[in-house]
């Protein structure tokens, strides 16, 4: 078996998708996403599983960031939950949603 090594200048990081990690599906003014609607429709998802809690990153982001530091990650790419920022898809912006992403990137 060959032994491969990453170059010393390789940047280790992580990436997440909002629906799969944030949870807090209806917290702080977040609107319903397409996935929320689909997952809450009876018979659509095995066992009725949803992303309602997921990893609870919305409430545990500080712990998650600490874990990333512990792992030595130098990069983090995440997706924005647009229903958290624009609950109806247009018009009024949700200040609590913006505040979450502000805290996450601070």
PLM region spans:
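Non-catalytic accessory regions flanking glycosidase/transglycosidase catalytic cores in CAZymes
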Residues: 1-106
């Amino acid at each position: 078996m060959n032994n491969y090594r990453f170059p010393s200048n390789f940047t280790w990081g992580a990436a997440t998708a909002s629906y799969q990690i944030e949870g807090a599906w209806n917290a702080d003014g977040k609107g319903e996403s397409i996935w929320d609607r689909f997952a809450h429709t009876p018979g659509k998802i095995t066992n009725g599983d949803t992303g309602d809690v997921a990893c609870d990153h919305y409430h545990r982001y500080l712990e998650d960031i600490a874990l990333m530091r512990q792992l030595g990650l130098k990069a983090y790419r995440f997706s924005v939950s647009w229903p958290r920022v624009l609950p109806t898809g247009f018009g009024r912006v949700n200040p609590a949603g913006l505040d979450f992403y502000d805290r996450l990137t601070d």
